[in-house]
Curated annotation (Swiss-Prot):
Pfam families: p450 (PF00067). Residues 205-253 are annotated as: Disordered. The gene is cyp525A1. Its EC number is 1.14.-.-. The chain crosses the membrane at residues 12-32. The lineage of its organism: Eukaryota, Amoebozoa, Evosea, Eumycetozoa, Dictyostelia. GO terms for molecular function: heme binding; iron ion binding; monooxygenase activity; oxidoreductase activity, acting on paired donors, with incorporation or reduction of molecular oxygen. Keywords: Heme, Iron, Membrane, Metal-binding, Monooxygenase, Oxidoreductase, Transmembrane, Transmembrane helix. This is Probable cytochrome P450 525A1. SUPFAM superfamilies: Cytochrome P450. The keyword rRNA-binding does not apply. It is a single-pass membrane protein.
Length: 601
């Protein structure tokens, strides 16, 4: 019995029912607001123009479910010949999904701001850096708070944490979370990161060797089978069988080139999840080792895939009705959340016993949990913050690494330049015995490596949208013309403001050739951490507490993999490269890359 199909049909029926109910409610609400607006009570507000809610929502819904083909705009490449040779590739990186959702209304309205009325509540989308800087500033932490969780998933996952708290409660959580992510502690995390990435490299090498051995055995078996078949088949059939077998072997693994084909997003997700588990609660989820059995394993038993399911649930449109109607996926969702909570509680209990007898002669590997236990934080707050760390720490890092390796695989000149910089850095660290040790590696001294990371963060920011809710009436001063009051935006309290980091990073007014992957542009960019046009980790008082860790982790993983493997994009196996937005920006389909072992390794 195909239960998957039945489940999908059941879910769609719920969706249609809720959509009809929501549409009727929306019509009634709009009629009430139409009458209310006649009293002129809202005339004092000067909201930017935008599409109707129905038009906006249908556009979002169709793109979410891929119910229509995307319409790519033909980009003008007449000036490509005038661009720097360091641009490497003139391929525009405007993805289908982003062009039809994130960037669509900014482009159509030719404006940095537009508004949508969501059941009478104004939503303002902005890529205005002056407005975003104002809203995210430390002075406005209490005036502009995070919007409520409409899906109900985050409330269950991280209610008592730095992610969902506000005011004094947020300041309390921030104070206890800051210490584990200090520069000193992040440096102490490096050995765990190196150990885990080495485990992945060994895993890939072993898979490559095993595939080579299996293919050799298959070839021998095929030869034997062909000899037996000679009695019954003609020579042409035997030759066809040989060709088919050889083609299958070549598709699975290019033995002559020591190449293995992997879904890079899947591997990066498992890698970062194992790293986060070890650093946060001292728990090895062993996701990397389970990669061999992906086809045999039930997704319900894979903790990294459980988190993937949870993240997908957060952005499903039907989730907005979960407070009123039970959903079929609630059973699986709450099961996964309970299992994760049990793991964390077990880690808390076991770690409490260990830390009671800790002689403090060695650094603590479980940086987050140890710090929370030392500060006598309540168990529910520990669970909330650990969940936040697991969620944000592995998902954003995995997506960033996936985008980096994808871009490197499609821009060979950048990949070669990066490899040469890494080799040159190693030569500088060779010791007296003419040997290089990992302890000698300085992951902060490779400037070009940081350029690659920054450029990827610009094109694919982990958090593509930052939401804030105004607590009071306010006036937002537009950066286009601050001296013209007509361009300012008057907003009522409870206005939802969505800052499009993705659109800011792709704004042609701020970035030259914004859709071109060009790491060399960062050579002349200064004061990177204080720019209003580059905010991949947000900005102001609620800037991402783990950004230092994220950059250090990326430096190590990229360096290790590029030094060991040459990457290329597998056009035959991969679907078109598309992105979609859930809590983070993530690839829509698996991204298959060829990992060719370098000859000097």
């Amino acid at each position: 019995m195909d239960t998957t199909k039945n489940n999908d049909e059941f879910d769609i029926s719920y969706f249609l029912t809720c959509s009809i109910f929501g549409f009727i409610l929306w019509i009634l609400t709009e009629q009430i607001l139409k009458y209310y607006n006649k009293t002129n009570k809202n005339n004092k507000y000067n909201l930017p123009k935008g599409p109707s809610f129905l038009k906006w929502f249908i556009n979002y819904l169709f793109n979410f479910y891929d119910l229509k083909l995307s319409n790519n705009k033909e980009e003008d490449n007449n000036n490509n010949n005038n661009k720097s040779n360091n641009s490497l590739s003139q391929e525009e990186l405007i993805e289908d999904t982003s062009e039809n959702t994130v960037l669509k209304w900014f482009n159509q309205l030719n404006s940095d701001n537009y508004s949508v009325s969501f059941f009478g509540r104004p939503m303002i989308f902005t890529r205005d850096t002056t407005i975003s800087k104002y809203i995210l500033s430390s002075n406005n932490i209490d005036n502009y708070t995070k919007p409520p969780d409409s899906s109900g998933v985050l409330i269950r996952l991280a209610q008592n944490s730095i992610l969902m708290s506000e005011g004094d409660q947020w300041r309390y959580h921030r104070s206890i979370i800051n210490q584990p992510f200090s520069s000193k502690n992040v440096k102490l995390m490096i050995p765990t990161i190196i150990t885990t990435i080495n485990k992945l490299i060994n895993h890939l090498n072993n898979n490559n060797n095993n595939n080579n051995n299996n293919n050799n055995n298959n070839n021998n078996n095929n030869n034997n089978n062909n000899n037996n078949n000679n009695n019954n088949n003609n020579n042409n059939n035997n030759n066809n069988n040989n060709n088919n077998n050889n083609n299958n072997n070549n598709n699975n693994n290019n033995n002559n080139n020591n190449t293995i084909i992997i879904d890079i997003h899947s591997y990066c997700t498992k890698l970062t999840f194992d790293i986060i588990g070890k650093l946060s609660i001292g728990y090895d989820f062993n996701s990397i080792e389970s990669s061999d059995n992906d086809n045999d394993n039930n997704d319900d038993d894979d903790i990294s895939k459980q988190f993937d399911f949870i993240l997908n649930e957060m952005i499903r449109p039907i989730r907005r009705f979960s407070s009123y109607l039970p959903l079929y996926n609630d059973i699986k969702l709450f099961k996964f959340l309970n299992e994760l909570e049990s793991i964390i509680k077990g880690a808390i209990n076991s770690r409490s016993l260990i830390t009671d007898n800790n002689n403090n002669k060695t650094y603590k590997k479980n940086f987050l949990l140890d710090n929370l236990l030392d500060d006598n934080v309540k168990e529910k707050d520990i669970i909330g913050n650990i969940n936040t760390f697991l969620l944000a720490g592995h998902e954003t890092s995995a997506n960033l690494l996936t985008f980096i390796f994808y871009l490197l695989s499609t821009h060979n000149n950048v990949q070669n330049d990066l490899y040469n910089h890494l080799i040159e850095n190693q030569k500088k660290k060779i010791n007296k015995d003419n040997k290089f040790t990992e302890e000698d590696e300085d992951y902060q001294s490779i400037e070009f490596l940081d350029w690659v990371i920054y450029e990827t963060l610009r094109l694919f920011p982990p958090a593509p949208m930052i939401g804030r809710t105004s607590k009071n009436d306010d006036i937002l001063k537009s950066g286009n013309n601050n001296n013209n009051n007509n361009n300012n935006i008057s907003i009522p309290s409870e206005t939802l403001i969505l800052i499009s980091v993705y659109a800011i990073h792709r704004d042609p007014k701020l970035w030259k050739d914004p859709n071109i992957f060009n790491p060399y542009r960062w050579k002349n960019i200064e004061n990177i951490n204080n720019r209003s046009d580059f905010i991949p980790f947000s900005s102001g008082g609620r800037v991402c507490v783990g950004q230092k860790f994220s950059i250090v982790e990326a430096r190590i993983i990229i360096s290790k993999l590029i030094l060991n493997f040459e990457l290329s994009f597998n056009n035959l196996k991969s679907k078109p490269f598309k992105i979609y937005q859930r809590a983070t920006l993530t690839p829509k389909y698996p991204v298959f890359l060829n990992f060719k072992k370098r000859e000097n390794k």
